[in-house]
Amino acid sequence: MMQNLFDLTGKVALITGGNGGIGLGMAEGLASQGCEVAIWGTNADKNDQALAVLRQYGPKVSAEVCDVSDPNAVADCFAASLKIHGRVDGCFANAGVGGRATAFDEMTQAEWDRIIGVNLNGVFYVFRCAAQHMKQRAQSGDAFGR
């Protein structure tokens, strides 16, 4: 991993699906540059494992168990992350699920709704919370973390 690419000390990033794969890789990259990181995932054990990895980089890290397809859960988890970190400067809506059916034409409506709930609606719910937070910060004179 590249070191000293740029300094993100004092910045906070929120990453959904941050407990594995691309999301954890993004979290590691940001933390390695001094960024505080809040990760969200649906599996508490995977969240704990990811936190153990992220803590080695030094900045404050946190995790929330969150189903991004639930707008109330997203709002609650965003508030919890803000309570821990005080702000969010960057938001990465990385959480995603695939279909469980072996073929598209065998997919049930419930399965389709689950996929759309996470992969589409979840992105909207997360970015809506982030945008509201960032807009509020900008209106109070803290535009773009400056």
What kind of region is each of these model predictions?
Residues 94-100:
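Conserved NAD(P)H cofactor-binding loop of Rossmann-fold oxidoreductase domains
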Residues 11, 60, 87-88, 134-146:
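Active-site loop of short-chain dehydrogenase/reductase
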Residues 33-49:
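Conserved glycine-rich Rossmann-like NAD(P)H-binding loop of the short-chain dehydrogenase/reductase
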Residues 12, 19-21, 43:
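Conserved glycine-rich cofactor-binding loop
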Residues 102-104, 111-116:
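Substrate-binding pocket helix/loop in short-chain dehydrogenase/reductase
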Residues 127-128:
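A short, exposed helix-loop element centered on a Lys and neighboring polar residues
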Residues 44, 65-77, 109:
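The beta1-alpha1 cofactor-binding region of Rossmann-like NAD(H)/NADP(H)-dependent oxidoreductases
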